[in-house]
Amino acid sequence: VRRSPWFHSTRAAFWGAIPAAVVFALSDRAPAPRAPALLAEPAPPSHRPAEPVDASAAAAPPIDASAAEPVDAGPPFERPTSLIALATWTPVRVEPRRDAQALGYLRAGATVDILDGPAGRDGCVVHRDHPEGGWYRVRGGGYVCVGGGFAVPAPYRGYRAPTQPDLDAGMPYPYGINYGQSIMYRRLPTLADLRVYEPWRFSRSTPDAGPVAAAEGLDAGTPPTSPAGTEADPSDTADNRAARRVAEVRDAGGPPRLGDLAGERGGPVVRRLLSGMYVALDRTIRSSGTDEVYWRTQSGGFVRNGRLAPVRNWSRFQGQVLDETHQLPLAWMVSETGWEYTPFANGLGASSHRRVPRLTPFVLADAPPIRSGAQTFWRTVDGRAVNQRNVRRALLRTPPEGVGPTEKWIDVDLDEQVLVAYEGARPVFATLISSGRGDRNSGVRNYESPTGSFRIQSRHITNTMDGDTAGDGPYSIEDVPWVMYFHGSYAIHGAFWHSYFGWRMSHGCINMSPPDARWLFLWADPALPAGWHGVYSGTTQPGARVELRHSRANAPEEGRPASAARAMPVAPTQ
């Protein structure tokens, strides 16, 4: 499984400007912690993120870092009070130099307050238009290179920032799911681009032709002509060769690889999208060249509106915040056909009382269970009972050795499929999760989550996850919400593509409903300063401890309800 956290990028890419009619919002929340002393920075991924793209009608292009020139000291200037990030990964470094470790990072369009500076220009390449450039210390700790390709003083005239994440919502961005094969462009495509990369759309007999079918009087089925003075076939591009390669692989009976979908570097195409791939949405833009509406994605790509369906039916399930009136043990109904029972007076059985919906919560009584043959029933505080097979239980656990009296830590029971957050010995939150599907006693398609004691290594408001999975083919989900990595590529994160929490569904990560993942993300350490998109743990600000365990010896794989397979017809889970 490959995942592509933005913080791994070694080369920043820039957001272009978009038409002035679009309004943008900036996010600035949360208190600022002290900068931690860092652990080792995570290793780079096996692939770099796709470069963002520019709108065709840019009002003010971003600064090109490659064209930046060192600036000689000039006349006195007024120190800027805030900066705006231009790159998809704008690092905040522990010291004012390029090779210093990163404390965290900003995403394009984010603004943060400047505390002081500049503290020199060691490795900070400054554009000649910014004599005030250099390393500035920002709120939250650390230094940002200002005046080059990463960030500039705010406000930046003419810059149209992408929509910033909403930290008050269950989902930080709106999302769309792709249906059929479509193309993510690096900029708004022209008619010439469509002729080359989507020639089938110029045939009136093609249902998906849209408004371009009659463009410039093209007849049905007429092939595109070569540009003047060009003898080569314009459709013989790396991007179309990639499309043919995908088709050939499918004709041979196998799924394409993720790399087969990538466009030619520097060309108009970022990549091709397959059914079930998700993108995070910024805003719509109408192309003047084709008179079509395109979604600009948070990654900077452009996807035709007609190919994307908005994601609306994500799970609103919420676990239980624990306090003096709400305590463990708790249980949730996870069966589609669950019943609540009335115990017999002699305690030797129970009779059915009423059907209850899936995800119904129960407060369990501190009483012995009811056993009837091979069945076990847990008593509830209201005098009823629930069948052990139909529910998942969250029980109080003694803190592991070494946990401080108020230290935050997370307990994940992989057999019960529940998560409980603690502060010392006090539980503060409990909910259902979905861990890796598969059986730890079998190596066949085994995506089981790891067990052991870990710590949160990094936290990201969103992070893209994609890769190739044997049997399932490639998958791609841009900007997965509320991500906290705890062991290599394993993370706790929100999942909006399924709702079967309480069942094993993932490729190894710990899935939570978006509202639950948001609650845990905002609660956990290390703290995320205002305006930052991601933060790394350190020795002075370690990440919250995460315990993953099995509560039952040799517990078999329980599978998932039959309706779970019907719930998400596309896109494998993460």
Which residues does each PLM region occupy?
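Cell wall/extracellular polymer interaction/catalysis modules
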Residues: H353, A365-T451
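Extracytoplasmic
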Residues: E78-P80, A87-W89, R107, P131-W135, ...
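Boundary regions of SH3-family modules and the immediately adjacent low-complexity/disordered segments
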Residues: L38, A68-P80, D129-E264, W295-T337, ...
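Ser/Thr-rich, Pro/Gly/Ala-heavy low-complexity intrinsically disordered linkers and tails
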Residues: A32-A73
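Sec-dependent N-terminal signal peptides
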Residues: V1-A37
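Short, structured beta-strand/loop micro-motifs enriched in basic residues and often containing a Trp
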Residues: A87-R97, G254-E264, E336-L348
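Exported/periplasmic cell-wall-interacting domains
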Residues: G402-P405, F429-L432, G438-D439, V444-T451, ...
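SH3/SH3-like (including bacterial SH3b) beta-barrel domains
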Residues: E95-A110, A262-M277, A345-R358
